Amino acid sequence: MPQASTFGSHSLEAHPLHIQPAVHIKLSKEERSHYREQYDSLKYISNYVSVFDQALSDNIDSRIRKENEALLKKYYESRKPFTFTSFRQGSVISSSDSSTGFTERTKTYCFLNDFVSNCVNEVDPYTLKMTVRNRNTALNMENLDDERKSKDDIYDFEDNTDDECNAKCHGAFHYSSERLEILRSRSTISYFKYYKKLLTVDLRDSDVLKRHNLWMPMITRRFRFLLVSSSKPEDVRLTTPIPTFSESDLDIFKNKTCPLFINGTDCVPRSYDTFSGSSVIASIFSEYKLPSLSYHCSVELNDQLFIVGGLMACHRYDEEAPDLKDFYVDGIKNLPPPLIPELINNPSMIPNPHLYCFSLTSSRLTRPDISGYIPPPLVCTQGCKLTERHIFLYGGFEIKSETQVDDKGRYFIRKRAFLNNTGYILDTVTFNFSKIELVAPPYQFAIYNNFSPRFGHMQASISNSNNNVSNENTTTSAKGRRSISPYRQGNGDHKIDDLVGSPGSTDYLEDDAIPPVTNPRSTDSLSSKHCSTATHICSSVNTILIFGGYSQTGDDKYEAMNDMWKINIPVVSRGKRNYYKFADTVTATKIPIIDDPELWPSRRAFSACCVPDYFTKDVEPIETRLLRNLKNDFSIDLEIRPGNKPSQPLFPNIPHSRKEKKSGRDSMHISNSNNSTSEDTSSKSTRNTTSSPPTSPKHTPPLNPSKKCASIGRTIAFHGGSDGYDVCSDMWWFDFDSETWTKIDLYAKTQEESDGLVPINLCMVGHSMTTVGHKVVLIGGLRQGDVDRIYRDETLPEEVISGVPLGSGVINVVDLNTQCLQGCKLIRNDGDTKESVIMDPHVGTPHQVLAVAGTIELVKGTMTLIGGVVAGREDISSLYLRGAVLQFILPSMNLAN
C-alpha cells in the first residue's frame, strides 16, 4: 500500500488560526540600523532518528524547509506589539486557565504545535508491517542497488504533482548506507522481535505503535572524529581537520552516523567523556522526537525528569532548517553570561510551551497535557522539589516579540525580556499548574526589603527532616540533631572538615525543645484552621532557598544580587496520595546579609549549586564498614565439642599460627578485642588517608581530624557564577541550621611534589555541580577566557603555552577531602603559577569543548544531560545543538580512583 505523506500536510491557507498577511510598512535607515541580519539556523552535533523513519529524497527535504520557513513567518506575524510599561512594573503571570477560551496563548500553541508536528513520526501501520517483514531481506542483501530497486516498488509518495519531484522521488528515494547498517545491526534484532508482537493488535489503533517508537542517537558525520572506540583508543583533538562532504543528497541519514550501532555503546564522543568509558548516548522510546532545548529547566522527581520552558529549535534536522535571510532581529541587549546572544536572539529558536517527562528507568519520553495556571514559556527559570508529588518553579524571563514587515517581505523582529516574579507549583500526578505570589514582609530598617524578580539565581530545597510526624496519640521522643558549624573568622582558609564538629560533642536538642506532634485522624483534607498550626509538621514539604541572580533595573539593564530568601509555602489542606493544596500568597523571609566578603558571597548569578550527600554518610573506607558489619552480625563458635579432635594448623612453622586450643569464651573475648583494636587502627588510618597530601607549610590548609555526620540535606554548596563579565572562582557552603556561610578554597598539585598543594582560581559560570561520594563534579560552563572572547570580542593570545587552560575539560572533579582538583597538575614557570595545567596520563587528554545552556540531573549514580549547545574553543562562535540525551555513569573507575 502506498505510504501516506507524513510531511507537507499543513495547509497554511486552511489553517484554523490563519493570520491575515501583515500590513507592509517602511522603515528608515536609522530604524533599520537597530536590526541585525545574517542569522543562521544552528546545526546539530547529536540528534535522534527513528528506526522506522523513511529515507527522504532531497525534494521532500526542500519542501519541509520551505514549510518551516513559512510557519516561522506566520508565527512572528502573530506577535502583537507590546508596551514596556504594562510589563516592567509588575510580574509576568499567566492569566490562562483550563476554562479560558480562544486566547493569545491558544494561537501561540497552535503555531508551535505545527513545528512540533514535524517532530512526530507518524508511522503508517501497513508500511510498518512491511518494513518489519522485509527486514530479513535487507539483512541478506549484498547489493545496494537491488535494495534500492525493491524499495522503489514498495514505496511511493502521494500528493506530489510536480513531475520533476516525481522523477526525483522515483530515482532518488532509497535507503542510505547508514540506514542499511542500522537494519543489519544485531543490536536491533531484539527490538524488531519485540515490535512484531505489537503488530498482532488492531492496526487501526496506530497510537499503540507510536508509543513504542524507538529513537536512536546519532552523531553528524562532520564530528565523526569525536567517536573513539574503547578497543582502539586514539588521541584526537577538536583541532583535527574536519572532513568536508558534498550536500548533493539531503537524506537525513546521509551525513550522519549512529554510535550505538557502529562499535556498541562503548563508542562515545570523548569530547563529552573526559573519563573515557563512563558515558552513554541513550536511546529513547517516544511518540515524539525530543526537541533540542536550551536554557530550560529540568527537575528530577521519583526517577523522572520534568522538563519545562527554554528555547527549542524549529527544525528537526539540519536538512530541514529554514532560511533566515528574510529575518532581521533587534535582539535583547547586554545579556550576561552564559546567555549567548547568537542563541537567545536567533529567530529559529522559539519558546518551548510544552512539558516533557523523561523516565530514567524505562528511557521513555512523554508529553502530557497540562492544565491550570500554565506559566508562559520561561527562559532560565529554576525548579526544585517541593514534596514527593509537587515541583516548585520560580524566576526566569519571558521573551516577547513584535514583528513588522516591509514591502520587500523582510521581517523586522524586536525581542525584549520580561522577568517573572510568580511562583508556580506543578502537580506531577494531574499535571496541573497553580500559581503563588511571593511577597516580602515589611522591615522597618531594611534597605532592600523588596523581593525582586530575578533569573539565573540559586534555588534549592531543604528537607525538613526534624519535623517528623508520629503515630496517633503518640508524642515524639526522638532527639532532633542538627549540625552547627562553629563561628569562624572568615579568612577563607577552611577545610571541609571544619564544617562539622567533633564526634565527642553532643549537639543535641533537649526533649522539651520539640513540641509533641500528633497525626490527624483522617488522611483526607484538613481544615485551614488545623493546617495553619500544622504548616511545618506536614513533613514532606521542603523549605525553598533562593540566592542572588539578576534583577532588571531598566530596559535591557541587569544587576547582580547577593540577597538570600527562605520560603516556607503554607499548606491549606492535604489529602491522599501526597495531595496538598497550597496558599495563593507566600511571605518570603530574608536572611540578613553580613557585609563581609569573607563571611558572605559577593553579588553573582548563574552559579552551580547542589545539596551534597558528603555529610549524610560516613566517609570511611568500605573495608571498615564490612568488618564492622561482620562483627555485629556474625560470630564464630570455636568451642570444641566432645568426641571431636582439635583442629590442627595448616602451616605450623609460621610464627603466628595457632599452637594451642582456647575456650570459646576466651576466643570470643580475644576476637572482640582484636576486632576493636583493628577497628581503631582502621579509624586512625582513615583519618590519615583523608588528610591532605604532603604540602608546603605556606600552602597547607588547616586540617581538622575530627568528623561527624550532619543532618541529611541541610547543607548547600555552590561554586562560581559571574557579576556581569567578571567570573567568580570561589566555593561556598551554606549551613541551613546556623544560617552561616563558609568559604572553601580550592587547590591543585604541581609538577614538583615538593611544592605541595597551591591555591587555584577555577573561574566558571553557567556550569552544573553535583557530588558523588566525596567528589565534587563540575560539568560544562564558561571560563573567564570564554567570556572575554564571546562578550568582549577578545582574541586568543598568540603565545603558545604548554598544557591546557584551567577548567577547559567538560568534567572537572574536586576531592572534598583535600579540596584538590583531580586529574591535572599546574604548570609553574619561574615561581609563578599560571592558569594552565597538564593532564595525568591515566586520565587522558581533555578536548577543548565548551558546553553550556543544558541541564544535568544525578539519579542513582547516572548523570543525565539534556539539551544545551556545544562549541570548540578554537572556534567558539560556531555553536551546535545537542539533540540527544547524554548519560554519565558515575563513579567511573578513573573518577573513583
From Swiss-Prot:
InterPro entries: Kelch-typ_b-propeller (IPR015915). The keyword Calcium does not apply. Kelch repeats lie at residues 304-352, 390-438, 543-589, 715-761. GO terms for biological process: glucose mediated signaling pathway; invasive growth in response to glucose limitation; negative regulation of Ras protein signal transduction; positive regulation of Ras protein signal transduction; protein polyubiquitination; pseudohyphal growth; ubiquitin-dependent protein catabolic process. Residues 694-704 have a biased composition (Pro residues). The modification Phosphoserine is found at S91. Keywords: Cytoplasm, Kelch repeat, Phosphoprotein, Repeat. It is found in: Cytoplasm. Residues 464-496, 638-706 are annotated as: Disordered. GO terms for molecular function: cAMP-dependent protein kinase inhibitor activity; GTPase activating protein binding. The modification Phosphothreonine is found at T161. GO terms for cellular component: cytoplasm; plasma membrane. Residues 464-477, 671-693 have a biased composition (Low complexity). Transmembrane segments: none annotated. Beta subunit of a guanine nucleotide-binding protein (G proteins). G proteins are involved as modulators or transducers in various transmembrane signaling systems. The beta and gamma chains are required for the GTPase activity, for replacement of GDP by GTP, and for G protein-effector interaction. Involved in the determination of the cAMP level according to nutritional conditions, most probably as a regulator of cAMP phosphodiesterase. Required for the control of pseudohyphal and haploid invasive growth. Present with 1640 molecules/cell in log phase SD medium. G proteins are composed of 3 units, alpha, beta and gamma. GPB1 interacts with the alpha subunit GPA2. This is Guanine nucleotide-binding protein subunit beta 1. It comes from Saccharomyces cerevisiae (strain ATCC 204508 / S288c) (Baker's yeast). The gene is GPB1.
